[in-house]
Amino acid sequence: MYSILKDAYSFDERCAQCWDGNWRETDDFFFDHPEIADKYGFATCFNGEPIGFICWDPRNRPEYVEIGHNAIRTAWKGNGFGKAQLTEALRRIREYAGLKEIRVRTNSNLIAPRNYESVGFVLYDRKENPGETAFSGDDLYYRIQLQREQMGNA
């Protein structure tokens, strides 16, 4: 997972300078807890090669589940793998009984906002990012409200 995250954000060396520790912690956590890895994330593979990774935090259920890391290796970007990966994660997350929302936080200068919006996420908050990661843009907060979806399907 670490190598996928590092490669996915290689377009700007400041990403690794700011987030390398977090990427390593995520990799270590999932390696040390394989029983969690299979329930709350997955790797996207093409021809047996891991090209992407996504994970989510279910601890705030039933109020919401928050998507964490969501990355595709640089060589595979622009081929629909990111949207397919996110769509599959949403399918799995929607299986939680009584879940009200799916949330994600990203940054305005990344390409991620377009991907989230393309699968139904709606922006509900935007905050200035004055810290060391300011180069990545404002913090954007997105959600999909599932209670409305469920009411529409009833």
Region annotations inferred by a language model:
Residues 43, 49-58, 64-66, 71:
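Conserved beta-strand in the GNAT
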Residues 117-126:
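Conserved acetyl-CoA-binding loop of GNAT-fold acetyltransferases
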Residues 3-31, 39:
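Conserved GNAT-fold acetyl-CoA-binding loop/helix
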Residues 103-113, 129-135:
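Conserved beta-strand-loop-alpha-helix junction that forms the acyl-donor binding cleft
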Residues 2-7, 145-154:
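Conserved N-terminal entry element of GNAT/NAT acetyltransferase domains
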Residues 72, 78-91, 117-118:
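Conserved acetyl-CoA-binding loop-helix of GNAT-fold acetyltransferases
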Residues 39, 136-143:
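Short hydrophobic/aromatic beta-strand or adjacent loop that forms the aromatic wall/cage
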Residues 93-106:
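Conserved GNAT acetyl-CoA-binding A-motif
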